Regions:
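Extracellular structured ligand-interaction cores
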Residues: 66-68, 79-81, 100-104, 154-156, ...
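Conserved small/polar residues in nucleotide/adenosyl-binding loops
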Residues: 227-232
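A short beta-strand-loop element at or near the start of a globular domain
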Residues: 32-83, 214-215
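Extracellular and analogous surface-interaction loops
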Residues: 68-78, 147-149, 187, 215-226
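Boundary/junction segments of secreted and surface-exposed precursor proteins
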Residues: 1-27, 194-199
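Extended, low-complexity, turn-rich repeat/linker tracts enriched in Gly/Pro/Ser/Thr and Asp/Glu
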Residues: 88-97
Length: 232
């Protein structure tokens, strides 16, 4: 079940996304800054923490990780649905934290601080793949956070305590250390066009070893004639 439909309606409105990484790129075989495309340290909202030569606000402890993003809704908007999605690397050749990936994460809105958000089993997905003869595991979790976002609307949002592994030795993960989050918000605004607003949640793996991937969605309808037909 790569993707699960979470919301669908026809309204004057749109879908907007906010989110952030939870780590900074590493150097080869080291927890130091570099350009390997694999994270070497988590970001943290605590700027008194620092990992080596990484900037302040970094940690190797997932329970201290965190990042912020700005949600900007047009004036006069109301939130119809909001989904928080997060994930990361949970398995390397030497470590496996599958016992932690269903733990709640900490979500803060402009109005509510440090709310524990438990993942919804309906959208929980784990992926085990082999990259360059290295077997690794990724996961995706999500939850409905509509009430929190509808109350807070625009402003700074943050997510903390997302379980994930960081391995310094690249051969343990084939350079796939990662962690991050996305907030998907479906909103209504009477100044916008009438649209079919449908949101799916889930994940799929795309890598050099797996090649391209095809995602099938159902019940997707379009007008017979429309000059501005778009999808995201």
């Amino acid at each position: 079940m790569p993707f699960v439909q979470r919301y669908s309606d026809v309204k004057k409105g749109a879908i907007i996304f906010a989110g952030n990484t939870l780590g900074l790129s590493k150097a080869a075989n080291s927890n130091s800054p570099g350009t390997e495309g694999s994270i070497g340290a988590f970001t943290s909202l605590n700027t008194s923490l620092q990992v080596g030569n990484f900037p302040a606000g970094t940690t190797l402890d997932y329970t201290l990780n965190g990042s912020r993003a700005q949600l900007s809704l047009p004036a006069g908007s109301s939130v119809l649905y909001a989904e928080l999605v997060w994930g990361g690397l949970y398995r390397s050749t030497v470590n496996n934290i599958s016992n932690l990936i269903n733990n709640p994460v900490v979500f803060s809105t402009p109005l509510s601080a440090n709310v524990q958000i438990a993942p919804d089993a309906a959208t929980s997905q784990d992926f085990v793949i082999t990259v360059d003869n290295v077997t690794v595991g990724f996961y995706v979790r999500s939850a409905n956070v509509t009430a929190l976002v509808a109350a807070a609307l625009s402003g700074a949002y943050s997510v903390q305590r997302v379980p994930a592994l960081i391995e310094a030795i690249d051969s343990r993960t084939s350079q796939t250390n990662h962690a991050g989050w996305t907030l998907a918000v479906v909103y209504e605004n009477q100044t916008l066009d009438l649209r079919n607003l449908t949101l799916w949640s889930g994940g799929n793996v795309v890598s050099p070893s797996t090649g391209s991937t095809t995602v099938t969605v159902t019940n997707f309808l379009t007008p017979v004639s429309y000059t501005h037909l778009r999808a995201h």
